[in-house]
């Protein structure tokens, strides 16, 4: 799996490439957790195009199960990319993203530059 390890401020991140295996459900989480543990990273950065479409259908329960698994392993998650078309289709998803972005464990952000700013705040 293609990824890079980066240090932003005092946090080590595993930044996954745009191309690669999809994160379809909680069974796939270990593919993304292993590199984080290997490099003692505190955050996983994953492009939103690596998330299966069902992730954004909150009724499926996939988003909750996947994100809870990362949190159980004490890993923060930044999901990077434009999800505005999906947000326009779902008030529930808008609420979910807004609440996630208020916290410290899971963030939906448009870019790595925005993540760097947020980590510096």
Please name every model-derived segment.
Residues 2-121:
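Amphipathic, Lys/Arg-enriched alpha-helical "gate/interface" segment within cytosolic domains
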């Amino acid at each position: 799996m293609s990824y890079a390890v980066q240090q932003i401020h005092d946090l080590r991140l595993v930044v996954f490439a745009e191309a690669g295996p999809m994160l379809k459900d909680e069974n796939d989480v270990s593919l993304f957790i292993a590199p984080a543990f290997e490099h003692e990273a505190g955050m996983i950065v994953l492009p939103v195009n690596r998330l299966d479409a069902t992730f954004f259908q909150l009724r499926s329960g996939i988003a909750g199960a996947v994100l809870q698994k990362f949190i159980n392993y004490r890993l923060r998650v930044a999901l990077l990319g434009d999800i505005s078309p999906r947000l326009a289709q779902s008030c529930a998803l808008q609420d979910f993203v807004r609440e996630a972005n208020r916290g410290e464990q899971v963030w939906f952000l448009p870019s790595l530059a925005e993540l760097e700013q947020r980590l510096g705040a």
